[in-house]
Amino acid sequence: YIQNQLFREFAFGDFRELTKRVTIDPAMLIYLDGYVSKAGNPNENYARELLELFAIGTGFYKDGTPHYLEHDIIELARALTGWTPDRLSVRFNPASFDKSVKTIFGKTAGFGIQGKAETDVIDYIFEQIDKDLQKPRSAVFLCTKLYQTFVHHEPDMEIVTAMAQTLSDNNWSVKA
């Protein structure tokens, strides 16, 4: 029920905020093993799904470099430690959070989420630029999925690029 309400609240709102909320949602923490992800023993399940299915997408740029590396998944998993379901809500346990610096997409920082570190890792993911289209990669990824779902299975990248620009220009608001 709670996760369903979360999706309803953000369905046509801020996609970046939805991503932040889903990341620490009790149902998601249980479903993808985030609740067992602790400093020194991070679980990579959600980190992998976040990049692959929700924010970046698998694949390669025209120059042959991948959208992300295995190392990025490992470091992202470390940034997502410390959260655990607490009945119908969620609790942050500082003792379970990996406080050390992480290197994700080539940047080294104290990554975490929800104000628990110097750099919000979800904001950082959404700042990544698609090397081929020079637009935020997450916007290109989401807009490609929307185009394929509602228009045609073969995306027109000129239209997708314009959609991605609109999405990022409007603070990740899907209804824009």
Spans of features found by a protein language model:
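Active-site substrate-binding loop specific to GH73 endo-beta-N-acetylglucosaminidase modules
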Residues: 1-176
